[in-house]
A protein has these predicted regions:
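Surface-exposed, beta-sheet-biased, low-hydrophobicity segments with strongly acidic/polar composition
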Residues: 1-108
Length: 108
C-alpha cells in the first residue's frame, strides 16, 4: 500500500492587547497513521490527532481532531479548513493566538 501524508498549510496570528502583533505561515506534513498525535506550530497546548484512516479503493478518508472539533479529510476532495485558538493573560495583558489550518491528504 502506498504511504500517504496529511498536509497542513497554516497561518498564525498573535495579538497582545493590540500593542504587539505577529504573523507567520508555513506547511507541515505528517504521516497519515491512525492514533498519531502531533503538536501544532506556535500553539503547543493544542494537538492534532488522527483518529481514523479508512481506505476504499483509491479513496483515503482521514478523521482528524483539532481543538475540540472533528474533521474528515479525503485525498480527492477540497482542502478542509480548521481553526485553533488560545487566549490567556500575561502580566495583566490579554493575549490571543489563532491558527487557521487547511488540510489535504497526498501520496508520499
Amino acid at each position: 500500500m502506498d504511504k500517504h501524508l496529511l498536509v497542513m498549510k497554516w497561518d498564525y496570528k498573535y495579538d497582545k492587547e493590540s500593542t504587539w502583533f505577529d504573523e507567520d505561515s508555513g506547511e507541515e506534513q505528517y504521516e497519515l497513521k491512525e492514533g498519531a498525535s502531533y503538536t501544532l506550530p506556535h500553539i503547543r497546548e493544542i494537538s492534532l490527532e488522527i483518529r481514523s484512516v479508512k481506505t476504499e479503493g483509491d479513496l483515503i478518508h482521514a478523521e482528524i481532531y483539532v481543538d475540540h472539533n472533528t474533521y474528515t479529510v479525503c485525498n480527492n476532495g477540497e482542502s478542509v479548513v480548521a481553526f485553533a485558538y488560545d487566549d490567556y493573560m500575561v502580566a495583566g495583558d490579554f493575549v490571543s493566538q489563532s491558527l487557521c489550518m487547511k488540510f489535504t491528504v497526498t501520496q508520499k
